[in-house]
């Protein structure tokens, strides 16, 4: 009788506490993906392929609506296949795919882009799968779209278009770390999952997840999160096999979002019992390098989260962050009294970056996970950016949210109260005498729209060349450089050589007399000496000649100033046109890369729309140089111009000839007079 009562009590207690979504059963030996669908393809030893089940269209009617792709080869169209809801959507794809001769069948990633391809957030999908029911983790992994192009969004309750697949490539160690713990469900994890890759700095293993050391068990009454831990618990080597605990839920009853919205960052998925469970994920913008092989033992550090925009989930969730004096996990409020914080940032052309640095000042070795009672009694805190920032945050519901703390403002960045700097804090770098353009790691291309995240300190340098300089953050330490994204600085050649200033060069406003005016008719007569020579003689002409020369010099100075201003204006126009041409070419190369399998931009748009931008910057620079040479050229002589007899030497020659003719006439007259006198006398 006592045993029966105890058994009934256990059943009742177990009924109160919701069962985990997943039951994980480990096998003895891990199993790897040793083969692919077709062809002679090579397998990368560092990856593990995971398949997921998607809910979508059951029959593909056209290539653009195909729900599966079997071969990921360049130029191979997708195969039209029937798709049954609940079917396991496995796709054979590895990072390294070559033909028997060793030639790669995939497109090469674009240059100047690190850690390619990229992912964005954690997303949920519906259905059953031997690995994970209702969850698609691409932490340290990538959903692939087309040929090595990363798909940033998985859709829920939508028809899957051509190329949208449900396969993830992750590190095998990470795979075992995720799926080797029994009795824990990982559907709700407040993970900062943007651009998480491993790096090694002289043997020191680091990452920026900040949330994989102590994963909490998911419960319907408490949306628990995980606290960062430097030394994770030992992981078993067995490969897990996940079994669903209940029947699959109906996809139509779980679809609560707008069906017309394809860019969903927050997606609600149901539990095994068919009820909806809200959750919220927080994306983080981190700057970290990619190691070719991921370390087997992670050591998480606090990350630098950033609230991503375009959050379209209408459910409720929580966003938590660790306190600087308490490194244990901060539990969230119950689902009926929670607040989901979304960033109101619908414009992609946002030139401000919300950077929040989280720093734990206590020792990592003393960190421990709080118990369930301690978590329920601890308050939950959320950090809200101030309203003055360009990127604003607001609550998605009108319920009373948790306690908010205003962060400190430091150099335009939002930071939590922390006395020590964070090595993973995002730095905005100013390149003096360069056009500095910062791009965030994870963006598809550095010069696409909305990717300029830093102010511009532009001071052009004369005689510079057009270069691409890929460097780390200036002023940062070596450890920060390991996590910093490359700064693509574009230095363009704008200004030609400029000689030293001469007298009346017009370079400065004070070079020329401001009292420049046009002479009247009387003043012209005075300058010509027509009115005063008969009275005062030609000696007084020098006074008026000096005034005439001064006025002429002012005219020359004003002309030089006008030439300099014209040259500077042309230089500004050349700067703008050169920059626009550079950006246009970069965007054109990016579009050509995306449309390579269809023949490129000219093939898709047609030859009439395939135009090029002619580079005339050299011609304009030559004209600017010529203007400056002309206005700085010092003229010599009288400069009367005209034919040879009116030139400088021509005038002297003419005077000499006239003088000789005059002497000859005088001699002739003298001779004539003597002859006439002789004959008369």
From Swiss-Prot:
Pfam families, sorted: Ebola-like_HR1-HR2 (PF22307), Filo_glycop (PF01611)
Transmembrane segments: 649-669
Side of membrane Cytoplasmic, spans: 670-681
Extracellular topological segments: 19-648
Ranges where the record places region Receptor-binding: 38-188
Ranges annotated as biased composition (Low complexity): 244-259, 342-351
Region: Fusion peptide, residue numbers: 529-549
Gene Ontology cellular component annotations, sorted alphabetically: host cell plasma membrane; membrane; viral envelope; virion membrane
Lipidation (S-palmitoyl cysteine): 671, 673
Annotated signal sequence range: 1-18
Glycan attachment points: 94, 171, 190, 202, 207, 219, 223, 255, 310, 323, 326, 337, 344-345, 350, 360, 389, 397, 408, 487, 564, 619
Keyword Amino-acid biosynthesis set for record: no
Biological process according to GO: fusion of virus membrane with host endosome membrane; symbiont entry into host cell; virion attachment to host cell
UniProt modification remark: N-glycosylated.
Annotated spans, Disordered: 223-351, 366-425
Family: Belongs to the filoviruses glycoprotein family.
Described function: GP1 is responsible for binding to the receptor(s) on target cells. Interacts with CD209/DC-SIGN and CLEC4M/DC-SIGNR which act as cofactors for virus entry into the host cell. Binding to CD209 and CLEC4M, which are respectively found on dendritic cells (DCs), and on endothelial cells of liver sinusoids and lymph node sinuses, facilitate infection of macrophages and endothelial cells. These interactions not only facilitate virus cell entry, but also allow capture of viral particles by DCs and subsequent transmission to susceptible cells without DCs infection (trans infection).
Protein name: Envelope glycoprotein
Source species of the chain: Lake Victoria marburgvirus (strain Popp-67)
Phylogenetic placement of the source organism: Viruses, Riboviria, Orthornavirae, Negarnaviricota, Haploviricotina
